[in-house]
Amino acid sequence: MGNVFTGMNISATGMTAQRTRLDIISQNIANVNSTRDADGNVYRRKSVIFEEKNYVSFSDSLVNATGNLGKGVKISQIFEDTEEPLKKVYDPSHPDADEDGYVYYPNVNTVTEMTDMIDASRSYEANVTAFNASKNMQLKALDIGK
């Protein structure tokens, strides 16, 4: 059994996770036209992978009744997409062109990033709504106790 702040804590982990996701999406959009990063490599699209906090596998939960009600979400990793090919543009006058005159641009699609940004923003808002609902229920419980 959790304490009275469990709902708020779970919502807070969701807000933190979505804020990080928004930061990564912003980095992707900011680097859409970059040909080189600080290390001299072409920027690659990044995405966030989430996992449940205090994850217990299904088989473990069958063997041991944990009573795990969930603790929220956390960032498992920030994934760099090396599968999607880079955009190759012929521009021999560009300072970053290779010996064949091609410039490589990040594998970032602005439309996809904007769609992901809307999704992350709405997920953040949903967590804020759940947080406020939990807070309001606690305030009502305090009023009842008066």
Give the location of each predicted region.
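Amphipathic alpha-helical polymerization modules
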Residues: 1-146
